[in-house]
Structure formats: C-alpha cells, structure tokens
Amino acid sequence: MAGRSGDNDDQLLLAVRIIKILYQSNPYSKPNGSRQARRNRRRRWRARQNQIDSISERILSSCLGRPAEPVPLQLPPIERLRLDCSEDCGNSGTQGVGDPQISGEPCMVLGAGTKE
C-alpha cells in the first residue's frame, strides 16, 4: 500500500483477515421454523452482527491509529445556503458558456411533455 512501511501493511492485512473471520463466523440463519422462531433468530443475528461491527471498528482503529470514519466536513450555516436558479441552471460542466438565464420564471430542466 503506497506510502507506508511494509510492517504496517502486514498489520493491516492481519486485521482485515481477523475481521473477515469474524463476519464469516456469523452466517445468516436458515429460513425454517415458525414466524416467531425466524424473528428471534433474525433479532439474535442482528445483535451479533452489531457486536461484530463494533469489534471490527475497534480492531481497525487500533491498527490504523485513527478512527475509521473521516472527519466531518464543516459546512457554512444553513442561513447562507441557497439554491438560486438565476445563477446556474442545470447544464453542469458548461457554466459560463452562453447567455445566463435572467428571467423571473423558474428554470425548466424538463420541458412540458405532451400526452398522446
């Protein structure tokens, strides 16, 4: 893996193998039995799956030395966010080409269809 030492790669591969074994140790239950029995099996399977998810996250964070989730993106306050159709209307990739729409009417991405 680019930019890291081989020792870290070996640790990461070992962690991935362990996580794979954990997930393989919890197969989904067979669909037989009464409705209540199936529901209980699914509930227990889901609980085990959640435990495996948290254990896997802990293994990866200890192996990588950082949380698996990226740092959340800082967004401006909601009051400053707006959609203004007069600035750019559809046609991504062609911004700044042609005449801008300045009419007071809303943009039409799809034209009015005719029913036959």
From Swiss-Prot:
It comes from the Viruses. Residues 26-48 are annotated as: Disordered. It is found in: Host nucleus, Host nucleolus; Host cytoplasm. Its main location: host cell. The modification Phosphoserine is found at S5, S92. Gene3D superfamilies: 6.10.140.630. The keyword RNA-binding applies. A motif (Nuclear localization signal and RNA-binding (RRE)) lies at residues 34-50. A motif (Nuclear export signal and binding to XPO1) lies at residues 73-84. Asymmetrically arginine dimethylated at one site by host PRMT6. Methylation impairs the RNA-binding activity and export of viral RNA from the nucleus to the cytoplasm. Phosphorylated by protein kinase CK2. Presence of, and maybe binding to the N-terminus of the regulatory beta subunit of CK2 is necessary for CK2-mediated Rev's phosphorylation. GO terms for molecular function: DNA-binding transcription factor activity; RNA binding. It holds the Pfam family REV. InterPro entries: REV_protein. One of its GO terms (cellular component) is host cell nucleolus. GO terms for biological process: mRNA transport; viral process. Keywords: AIDS, Host cytoplasm, Host nucleus, Host-virus interaction, Methylation, mRNA transport, Phosphoprotein, RNA-binding, Transport. Residues 18-26 are annotated as: Homomultimerization. Residues 36-47 have a biased composition (Basic residues). HIV-1 lineages are divided in three main groups, M (for Major), O (for Outlier), and N (for New, or Non-M, Non-O). The vast majority of strains found worldwide belong to the group M. Group O seems to be endemic to and largely confined to Cameroon and neighboring countries in West Central Africa, where these viruses represent a small minority of HIV-1 strains. The group N is represented by a limited number of isolates from Cameroonian persons. The group M is further subdivided in 9 clades or subtypes (A to D, F to H, J and K). Belongs to the HIV-1 REV protein family. Escorts unspliced or incompletely spliced viral pre-mRNAs (late transcripts) out of the nucleus of infected cells. These pre-mRNAs carry a recognition sequence called Rev responsive element (RRE) located in the env gene, that is not present in fully spliced viral mRNAs (early transcripts). This function is essential since most viral proteins are translated from unspliced or partially spliced pre-mRNAs which cannot exit the nucleus by the pathway used by fully processed cellular mRNAs. Rev itself is translated from a fully spliced mRNA that readily exits the nucleus. Homomultimer; when bound to the RRE. Multimeric assembly is essential for activity and may involve XPO1. Binds to human KPNB1, XPO1, TNPO1, RANBP5 and IPO7. Interacts with the viral Integrase. Interacts with human KHDRBS1. Interacts with human NAP1; this interaction decreases Rev multimerization and stimulates its activity. Interacts with human DEAD-box helicases DDX3 and DDX24; these interactions may serve for viral RNA export to the cytoplasm and packaging, respectively. The RNA-binding motif binds to the RRE, a 240 bp stem-and-loop structure present in incompletely spliced viral pre-mRNAs. This region also contains the NLS which mediates nuclear localization via KPNB1 binding and, when the N-terminal sequence is present, nucleolar targeting. These overlapping functions prevent Rev bound to RRE from undesirable return to the nucleus. When Rev binds the RRE, the NLS becomes masked while the NES remains accessible. The leucine-rich NES mediates binding to human XPO1. This is Protein Rev. It comes from Human immunodeficiency virus type 1 group M subtype J (isolate SE9173) (HIV-1).
